[in-house]
Amino acid sequence: MLYARKISEDGWFGKEALDADSVSELGTKNHELSVWKVSDAKNNIDVDRVALALALTLGKVSEFYMVLLDPCDLQSRYKWAVAFAPQDGDTRYKKMKGEHTNFVLDTFWEQGYLSEYIHQLIEDPNNYRYYDANSIKKMVYDALKAGDVEWEDIKFDGAWKKAIKEMEEVYGSLKL
């Protein structure tokens, strides 16, 4: 199984050397770093569901990158057995809440290993996905239409409400 983590363009891409900005993006709370389970990274539908769950943790619709992490590869490269702290995701995509967990990073060494690992992974575009705002808007529209995301969970958030309205103008009313 792989695990997805949101990363920023400014924090990671276009840098020859790993720097403090990249490392600081892997900040923890109680030594735990939020990640999402990806059961089949070759299945774009599965990966997109994780991306939508991650997007629906945010208060606004915005682009992001999502890197795919392999704990077995981390173990092999760094002799670090990643520990997990299960926790439901704080997402409005209720069906995906259980697909969230945390990596436990007890030391700066572990944070550093993970940072170096991500820095190396993103050299290959197959190890990350990019989602622009319009793709995310369309994904949430489709999820609402399919009944995977409930209108009640997002209707009071102005940014998401506006995004759905934009998609309805293009793809038709959802009659919510």
Describe these PLM feature segments.
Residues L26-H31, D40-L176:
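Conserved NAD+-utilizing ADP-ribose enzyme module
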Residues K37:
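Short HxH-centered metal-ligating active-site micro-motif
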